[in-house]
């Protein structure tokens, strides 16, 4: 009987140690994934366009391309670039 109880307690201790290790590994992977996302986001910001394309979000500091105009369109809660009914000259 004592051996069975000792075995159960030992097994629970092993499971506790293993789960702690898995949790630490999972947290490390989560942090690594978050850093990777931030790096990709920073890389895409450096490749920002000079103008916003069709249906792109626009503001004073983010102008639309020449053949588009910045308008508020309901139900969208921000301004978007829409066609101004002209064609760009090439």
From Swiss-Prot:
Disulfide bonds join 51-65, 58-70, 64-81. Expressed by the venom gland. Its main location: secreted. Residues 1-19 form the signal peptide. One of its GO terms (molecular function) is toxin activity. One of its GO terms (cellular component) is extracellular region. InterPro entries: Huwentoxin-1. It holds the Pfam family Toxin_12. It is found in: Secreted. Keywords: Disulfide bond, Ion channel impairing toxin, Knottin, Secreted, Signal, Toxin. Residues 20-50 form a propeptide. Belongs to the neurotoxin 10 (Hwtx-1) family. 13 (Hntx-13) subfamily. Ion channel inhibitor. The presence of a 'disulfide through disulfide knot' structurally defines this protein as a knottin. This is U7-theraphotoxin-Hhn1a 2.
